[in-house]
Amino acid sequence: ELDESVKVSYEHESQLASKPDFFGIGAEHFLELALREGEWVIRRDWYLDPLDVDAGSVSSGTALSSPFEIDVPYLPEILTATADSGDDKEYAYLYNRENAVAYADKYCGLAWGCGNNRKYNPLYENFTGLGGDCTNFVSQVLGDKEAGNLPMTYTWRYVPNGAGAGATRAWAQASSLLSYLLSSGRAERLARGTYSDLIAPSETYPGGAIGALNAGDLIAYEKNGRIEHFAVVIGADSGLYLLVNSHTADRYHVPWDLGWDCDTVFWLLKIVI
């Protein structure tokens, strides 16, 4: 394995005289080496391009599994419910946005700028090799006691060890988390549309729907009718452009639409509790 961490600087065209903004990206490479004429050379390199999330797996050999969906066999049989059972309605709580953002910065992984020595939180399984860790990371941001501190439920929880250890579908799968958040009332869909749709002024959102998100809110990414990715909103850059953190690939303070094409459908989700 080989870890890659990159710092990227950029400037807005309207602010070329100002100081540049920075974001970080990271990638984990799985290398196959071959000994040729007494020297080790790279024969194959499997990785996810952190600047082109929409491309999926990039490889010179056999592709990795889909980077965005965890296959059912990796999840405990007893924890596969996806519909909200109402078991979280009894709680009185508030989402801690400040801690959620701090957690997202601390545990965003290999990208430049991430904390914790650029390591994931060791208390949670890393699903990168099993299909992708983006949704697991967002669930941590929402529910870890160090982060947003939303109480786990039967439908949405992570069990670190013992009977039933593992993640529920709603915790680890993008489409299931989206369904859970909306059905449970923990999130509200502000808008769903392409980039052009979300930056266009409307009566409800004069500055565009994208401007209605705050730090700690979420964006889900849909391609061909399938929810493929999740990211957490961190804030905005000097040009007030929304920034996100994510896993698979690891991103720190990256512009929210970078790497996604004009056909991508974005779901803007506001955490409302």
Predicted segments, located by residue:
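Low-complexity, Gly/Ser/Thr/Pro-rich intrinsically disordered linker/tail segments
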Residues: L240-R251, W256-I273
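Surface-exposed, charged secondary-structure patches
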Residues: E1-L16
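N-terminal capping segments
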Residues: P76-A172
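Solvent-exposed loop/turn segments at secondary-structure junctions
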Residues: V8, A111, N224-E228, S238-G239, ...
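Short beta-strand edge/turn micro-motifs at domain boundaries
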Residues: K19-E77, L242
